[in-house]
């Protein structure tokens, strides 16, 4: 009997010694394996991302091959053609990245803002939008200055550019600084009021300074990890931290573009990862939620990320073909005289113009009268560039020959 009590006492003593020495680790393990474990950053080996190399390797090889083919194809083209391809891809990237978050930007304002900053002449003037200017600044810094060191100040500058008024919609937010938990924890929630579903809860604000410092160090670190994999890791890591009151998704995708540009090692962007993510928006959120609630094995996330990156590169054929067709058009009509309005509309018409071109749309695009629009269009018909289709209210115009 005495022996049993001695053994119980010894076991109790060893348990308390273990808790005293390894208390934090034991607590973390309970969170890992017990009911309290919910999110990836609660893993005791948080930051030590793992993946199965054999599942990733073939994807990397396929992507490298597709990258090489695309860059080789574009490299032989002239300066103006490459600039127009860059303009088109950056425009799509910015629009689609914002669209993922439910924000719809005017394509022509975005395009005009990028063109102005890159010194590309697209003809005509387009009004400036404060919302557009900020996101364009961020994307151009990420892709044109891709080799620059990432710093807290640079990242905070991106955030400030996204929210120049200090408001997100009607709500005042903390701009140019990491979030706090003054109004409660940062959560990703869906559903109507009273029926909300919490998909994810980010780490407490009091650890963000250290966590973001670790992430920034990782971005800048020179190591053997392929930039394609690093882009996927940084995307996940940043979204997991959700360091700002708003704009986290757009900044995560800007960081992704920066690292993909490092992989390509050129300022020219000929494919849009954000456009591909937008196409698969539901599965994007699903895989993020699953990964954010899992272990440090992020193989499934990286497979999803790399598969969609490969599709994005392969899908760039449509974009590059549009640019090439435009170049061929302007080369063919290099000696033809066009006024500024005609140049503006012709360029827009060749950029996947939505709907039919009418005199009313022409007048609106060029801020001119319908009589002037009619004369402009009539001139293009006489030059055998446009043909008239339909009659009455259904009258519209299209290219005489396929572009």
Positions of predicted regions on the chain:
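FIC/Doc superfamily catalytic core
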Residues: 2-403
